[in-house]
């Protein structure tokens, strides 16, 4: 696991966006796994700017969702499909066939979960997966004590996660669904490169447990320690509880440029 400490969210977004752009230059049809929420927006903003400037060709690029609410009406503006289209697909100018996501409105949710795992495998797997992290250490919607070998499945959200997400529903927690389809931790770990971005002091404890604590289901993000190519990008506030912060700064400052993230 590599830990990169950046000054702020904008710097983290630019760093990750350049890694994604480099991936698409090497492999034009690479599959990018995208996360939702406010944290990854600087990544998408920086990536959109690169596309607009002609720094990267995305005509063959593909994206896929990490998760989806269950039971929201089709076209609901806060469904993750609508969010990804709004934040990523449309700004980048991607085509309608570039986007893969689970069906949160399916009558048979279990079948939809299994179908999504098959769709990811049929697409050749995820090349780079963007991740956020919850205040309780969740990734995707794999809440504490999720199996580290779990596959895409339906999960019940914790009340803390519903409280955290109420800001997207007019601060009305009653509008926040109780269930989601999420890639499992085992599914997430199959991506070739995992990049987790965390910003703000509120994420500091979760980051410290993820990076410096033991691998444990109670901190789902700690499973990144088991991945052969995992990168954790944090701003100064989110890094504030890392005991090894000086070491992480030193190693990144002396990393060969050609290695990238």
What are these model-derived regions, one by one?
Residues 1-32, 49:
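N-terminal glycine-/serine-/threonine-rich phosphate-binding loop
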Residues 33-37, 65, 102-103, 130-133, ...:
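Short beta-strand segments
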Residues 56-130, 246, 251-260:
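Ligand-binding beta-strand-loop-alpha-helix segment within the catalytic cores
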Residues 186, 190-261:
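ATP/nucleoside-binding phosphotransfer catalytic cores, i.e., glycine-rich phosphate-binding loops
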Residues 29-30, 38-39, 43, 119-144:
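A glycine-rich beta-strand to alpha-helix segment
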């Amino acid at each position: 696991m590599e830990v990169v400490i950046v000054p702020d969210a904008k710097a983290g977004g630019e760093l990750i966006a350049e890694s994604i752009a480099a991936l698409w230059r090497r492999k034009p049809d690479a599959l990018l796994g995208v996360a939702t929420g406010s944290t990854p927006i600087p990544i998408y903003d920086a990536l959109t700017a690169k596309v607009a400037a002609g720094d990267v060709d995305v005509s063959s690029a593909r994206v896929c969702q990490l998760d989806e609410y269950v039971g929201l009406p089709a076209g609901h503006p806060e469904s993750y499909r609508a969010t990804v289209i709004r934040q990523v697909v449309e700004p980048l100018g991607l085509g309608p066939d570039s986007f893969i996501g689970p069906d949160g409105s399916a009558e048979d949710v279990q079948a939809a979960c299994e179908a999504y795992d098959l769709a990811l495998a049929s697409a050749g797997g995820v090349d780079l997966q963007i991740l956020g992290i919850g205040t309780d250490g969740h990734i995707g919607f794999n809440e504490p004590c999720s199996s580290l070998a779990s596959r895409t499945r339906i999960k019940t959200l914790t009340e803390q996660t519903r409280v955290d997400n109420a800001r997207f529903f007019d601060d009305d927690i009653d509008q926040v669904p109780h269930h989601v389809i999420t890639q499992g931790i085992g599914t997430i770990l199959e991506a070739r490169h995992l990049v987790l971005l965390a910003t703000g002091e509120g994420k500091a404890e979760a980051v410290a447990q993820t990076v410096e604590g033991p691998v444990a289901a109670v901190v789902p993000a700690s499973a990144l320690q088991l991945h052969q190519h995992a990168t954790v990008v944090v701003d100064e506030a989110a890094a504030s509880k890392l005991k090894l912060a000086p070491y992480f700064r030193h190693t990144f400052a002396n990393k060969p440029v050609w290695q990238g993230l």
